[in-house]
Amino acid sequence: MARIVLKIDVDTLRGTREGVPNLARIFDRFSARATFLFSLGPDHTGWALRRVFRPGFLKKVSRTSVVEHYGVKQLMYGVLLPGPDIGRRAIADMRAIHEAGFECGIHTWDHVYWQDNVRMRDRDWTAREMQKSHARFIDIFGAPPVTHGAAGWQMNDAAFEQIDAWGMRYASDGRGHSPYLPVVGGRTLSHVQMPTTLPTLDEVLGIDGIDTHNVAAHILKFTETNPHDQVFTLHAELEGQKLAPVFEQLLAGWRAQGHTFATMGDYHATLDRDSLPSYPVTWGEIPGRSGELIVQPD
């Protein structure tokens, strides 16, 4: 029926070392193509605890069992333990995924630092953070990255412009309903934004009686009779670990519905850029997620 683009955000050292290879094995069993987006610098997961005073944050973490999914040690990075350098400590794990034939791209340099700061930062700060991740990616993989997917769907105008400056043809930095060309400062950029179109597991778990036993069926309702291509974002720390059985149910369900699995690059190759609409960079809220993020206007 349609393509399901599988986009994996890798936020942490543990996710890179444990969740990523677990997902690779799952994808092999399903003959599924996918795109891995890596965090390439320090793991400061513990800094996220400062979000406790943000509206909706406590409600979200109470639904998704943060300690169970991330582990106590992981939550101490940047608080009681120094943040390990993911790109140094897990270089072999990242290279193995690339060598296995999966598409790889940039998620961020420092996940929590980017997510909590980028919206209000200037062009110089943004360029420094993005160039660190770009240089590290080349160090690890020996070639420039082809795509980008922002941490927490958080960006600013300069970040979108940097994607153009890198020569990337496509990225997935927000939420929405279909591919489009982003407009910044009245100027239409060159790269295509392919937003996440489906809800993530952690956004629906714990809502209206949805749990690990029925969440796959809930997500599958969005694609049961929908002929349009979709972008699904998953996390190495969730679907690659405790939620792996649920994710396998999703993959089996999508295959039974007649869908195929694709990388971001596969999806981009099917698009006619000249026919795509343009939309200004916009912020908004998504059910099940605290705070504002990049959204595609309706």
What residue ranges belong to the model's regions?
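Catalytic alpha-helical scaffold of carbohydrate-active enzymes acting on polysaccharides/glycoconjugates
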Residues: M1-T147, G152-V192, I210-F232, E239-D298
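Positively charged, amphipathic and often flexible ligand-engagement surfaces
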Residues: Q193-I207
